[in-house]
Amino acid sequence: MPTDHTRTAILSAAERLYADRGFADVTLRDIVAAADVNLAAVNYHFGSKDELIAELFVTRSMATNRQRLNELKAAELAGGGRAAIDAIFRALVGPTLRGCLGPDNERSAAARFMIRASIESVPPIRRIKNREIDHLRKFAAAMRRSLPGRDQVELYWGLHFALAMAHQTIRDSERLIKLSEGSCDLNDVAGILDRIVSVSVMALTGGEAEKMPPAKLAARDAR
């Protein structure tokens, strides 16, 4: 098998196995068997299981981040250089939600791998998430342009909470379905996106809670 085909076969088999069984339960020997290659080929191309996981995650994350930045660029062009805050949040979380949610039969191995990466915290993925933040800096800058009078710290929290809502929805989708007895439709990705964007915008732009210090909020809620 040519070298590039061997590499592709390993990546494809690993992605499928990790998506289906999780990171801890899949061994390099499982991947070797599924890819129909020898262990030396995995060691030659990737060096270790962690490096293999890292390459898969980087490849898929780069595709998502490109889509995010393309949507952000379009929103800023539409706004004459200053995107509306709702359009910024939509570009931030939309690609992830559309890639990971929806009917099961529409989910590719790539999408299921990214869902697994969101559910399971493993060292190579944590390291990449903590290191690769340049695209998020661009979103933070867009938020500052959109809301120039807003405290920068609040904008960072707003960005963080929007991402947290999206990832929590992906991680615990089955629990939400059970809790709501099926009334919350996780196949309605557009509706989920609208809800996350709406809450994110509200947190930054509206209401008494935005202006009141945390200590005063606690005192008020205790009454």
What would you call each of these model-derived segments?
Residues A9, L17, R21-T59:
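Helix-turn-helix
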Residues K49, L56, R60, T64, ...:
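Hydrophobic/aromatic residues within well-ordered alpha-helical segments
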Residues E51, R60-A75:
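Conserved phosphoryl-transfer catalytic core
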Residues L69-S108:
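Hydrophobic alpha-helical connector segments
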Residues A87, R98, G102, I133-R223:
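C-terminal peripheral helix-coil segments that are non-catalytic and often amphipathic
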Residues A87-A91, G102-I133, S173-K178:
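Amphipathic alpha-helical segments used for helix-helix packing
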Residues L92, T96, A111-S118, A162, ...:
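Short alpha-helical scaffolding segments that buttress acidic/His motifs in well-ordered protein cores
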